[in-house]
A protein has these predicted regions:
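Conserved alpha-helical segments that form or flank metal/cofactor-binding pockets of metalloenzymes
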Residues: 2-34, 100-105
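Acidic/His metal-coordination segments adjacent to aromatic residues that form catalytic metal sites
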Residues: 32-60, 110-111, 124-149
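Non-transmembrane, amphipathic alpha-helical segments
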Residues: 52, 56, 85, 113-116, ...
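A contiguous pocket-lining binding segment that forms or flanks enzyme active sites
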Residues: 81-143
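Extended, helix-rich structural scaffolds rather than catalytic motifs
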Residues: 115-222
Length: 222
């Protein structure tokens, strides 16, 4: 499981590099922004239930299926730089989905674990719905410029169908009638857990007085 966040950090860096052409830097967007400026889904800022492996696995599954669908919608983007990065990332994301599915399939075979999987699904599903909420008023531009080939509603439907088919096949009850979580995140409205998480996430950068993110290899030597 530890390989997945390492992959995702690498993917994030690819996207940060892609927008540098517009005058942004990874440092300014990530480490030097204020926590209230972030517009991500609140699914990723919720604390894990201590000792609950089901929570981690279900969260990974719900997120990775959404990410897989989003990447599919970017494969034929009108922007070459997006298409190129999508092809690089897609293979690893396919593995992430398979890995999460494999763990869920194994856990539902245990009477105790299946209850924890269901509880995690009930808790996390409303927050997973926030992955398909719009960010500001840019959604119409995303569609108009051909950046994505699917709308958020289409991606949501594809995600829900895929998640429901897999999980109901394991005799899990998918809460498809759940309302989206109160705190969406993509509208800058975060949970109380986000500010302390951001503080921890950026503490090394601040305490070490860094002004440039560390890279393993210079871009010219890749």
């Amino acid at each position: 499981m530890e390989n997945t966040p390492q992959d995702d950090l690498g993917h994030a860096r690819l996207w940060y590099e892609a927008i540098q052409q517009f005058g942004y830097t990874e440092e300014s967007l990530l480490f030097e922004s204020n926590p209230e400026d972030f517009q991500h889904s609140t699914l990723v800022e919720l604390p894990f239930k201590k000792g609950d492996w089901a929570d981690a696995v279900v969260r990974a599954y719900l997120y990775d299926v959404a990410e897989d669908i989003r990447l599919s919608a970017l494969e034929n983007s009108s922007y070459e730089i997006i298409r190129d990065r999508t092809s690089t990332i897609q293979g690893e994301e396919d593995y992430h989905v398979e890995h999460a599915q494999s763990w869920i399939e194994r856990m539902v075979l245990d009477d105790d674990a299946v209850g924890r999987v269901q509880a995690a699904l009930n808790r996390l599903y409303p927050y997973a719905l926030t992955l398909f909420e719009p960010v500001g008023d840019v959604e119409s531009d995303i569609e108009a410029f051909g950046i994505r080939t699917m709308s958020l509603d289409e991606m949501h439907t594809a995600w829900e169908n895929r998640v429901e088919e897999f999980l109901t096949g394991l005799n899990l009850d998918v809460p498809t009638d759940a309302e989206v979580a109160e705190h969406i995140g993509r509208d800058n409205n975060h949970t109380d857990d986000w500010a302390p998480l951001f503080e921890e996430m950026t503490s090394s950068y601040r305490n070490l007085d860094r002004n440039k993110a560390t890279v393993i290899m210079d871009k010219d030597n890749e």
